[in-house]
Each structure stands twice: as structure tokens, then as C-alpha cells.
Amino acid sequence: IKLGEMLTNPERVGVHSLYVFSSNPAITAPNQNVVRKGLMRNDLFTIVHERFFTDTCKYADIILPATTSVEHDDIYNSYGHYTIGTGYKLIDPVGESRSNWQVIAELAKRMGLEDAFFNLSERELIEQIVHTSSRISKRDQELILNGEPVEMTVPENYKMDFKTPSGKIELYNPQ
């Protein structure tokens, strides 16, 4: 389901709170006008957890400060490539900023979710992700966990199926 439809379709409007993090749906989600209309609903309680004041922050009831990439442990993949790497905390969070994981884990606890998963530290979560991936070799797991970026291989049978006459991405279609 697309976000705009989820927030505005009278038959589907069951969403009364929204937690937005590491995203700016007011300008990046498909059909932005519908998304913004949904974000303006009086009965929608919106929390935005961000490092910057984004367009989506304009629709928030609460804005929470997020940590920067040097203030928390994280695992990263690159856009348009198949590289995986880790970034480890260099400094303590500034002010009252919290990482995405800290906020999500705390919300889970306050909602009564008792799964041990929410007790993991960021580092433990990264290790679990890396160690349980069937596509990452033991050697590459250690490289990633030691902070080295690893270029993943694309499976031989991988094929993107674009619904265009050429079967490829077409930035301009003369039809």
C-alpha cells in the first residue's frame, strides 16, 4: 500500500499515529500531494525523528533529535552498488539525540513488547544481521564487522524485470 493512500483513503484510514525516521515522505514518497494531504489530518499524530529539519517535520506534532552517523553503531549498504559496511560510534550523542534503534527499542519496551530482540545493543544487532545472512561468507562477515566495506556479488540468476519495451530502465519513452 502506498503511504498517501494509506493516510487518505476513507476505507483504509486506520492509521492515527505515524513515526517517521530516516525518511522524508513529504517530498520523496510517490504522489506527494496526497501524502501531504494525509500528513495534514487533524486526527493523525506524527512524530519525526531526524537529524535535519525536513519538509516532513513541518507536519509533525513532535520532532525528536536523531544521532548522526558518528554517534551510533550502524550497518550500511550503498545506493546503486552492492557494498556493505559498518560505521562505529566515535562520539557520544550530542544533547538529547538518540539513534533510531534506541528510540525503536524504547518504544517497544514501553508498549509491553518483551521480545529479547529489543534488548540487543546496536553492535549486537549488527552482528546478528551479519552472522545470519546466508549471502555473506564467514570471511566477509569478519571484514564487515571489523569496519571494512565488502563488495557483494550479484547472484548469476539475478535479473531486473522492467516493464518497458527494452526491458531496461527508460528515462524517456517515445511512445
Give the predicted meaning of each segment.
Residues 1, 123-175:
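Long, low-complexity segments enriched in small/aliphatic residues
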Residues 1-136:
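Non-catalytic alpha/beta scaffold blocks inside enzyme catalytic domains
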